[in-house]
Amino acid sequence: MQYRRFGRTNLKIPILSLGGMRFQKSWEQLDFSEISNEEQNKVENILNLANKYGLSHVETAKYYGTSEVQLGMGFKNIEKIPNIIQTKIPPNSDPEIFKRDVMTSIEKLKVKRIDLLAIHGINTDEHLHHAVKDGGCIDILRNLQKENLIGSIGFSTHGKSSLIEKAISTNFFDYVNLHWYFINQENTKVINLANKYDLGVFIISPVSYTHLRAHETRTY
């Protein structure tokens, strides 16, 4: 496996990561007791295989159904936990709800510290405002950093390039998860700006949806 420096996080991240969106029995937030041994064994077998081939970065999200709870149980049962664990939490107008969501994810993943914590889906100006306002989501995450509960702070986005540039220019983030593909390079300027700020750049779903077909206009 090849690795790259992930911007100012200074983490060495593999060029291929293990996405956890499909590590789930359901999109609903089920109790672990509702997940069969067969379903859980699939997750743990994949984690062991990923470890064998050097995929040391695993990412998931609050919105990925049972993914966090299944990964958390998997981390307890496999031989080696991935070096880099990332989860993503949606922005919220109420910082205390956002903090509660972060703490719930840490509990589900059964780890002492989340290496990469992304604000999930900064797709509108309102989302960005909730993230960066005084006393907002970023301030919550800074306090959790001081408690060593999270590492680097990033954001994921399906938003327009102009919005992503605005978020990067706040200089509040260490990395960004965004779309960029061989046949759709609208975010090239965004990536150049991210490089200027030394942000890590993570490409979202490079082989899913319509991204390997002709360009289609998105609406947000």
Each language-model region and where it sits:
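N-terminal binding-site loop/beta-alpha segment at the start of enzyme catalytic domains
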Residues: M1-N83
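Glycine/proline-rich, positively charged
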Residues: W27-I35, S93-K189, L199-F202
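Anion (oxyanion) recognition and catalysis
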Residues: N51, I191-K196
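Helix C-cap/helix->beta junction micro-motif
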Residues: Y53, I81, E147-N148, Y197
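Structural motif corresponding to the early beta-alpha repeats
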Residues: Y63, I78-I97, H120-N123
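A short acidic, amphipathic alpha-helical/loop segment
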Residues: Q70-G74, K166-A167, K189-L193
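Generic beta-sheet signal
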Residues: Q86-K88, H179, F202-P206
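Conserved small/polar residues in nucleotide/adenosyl-binding loops
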Residues: T210-T219
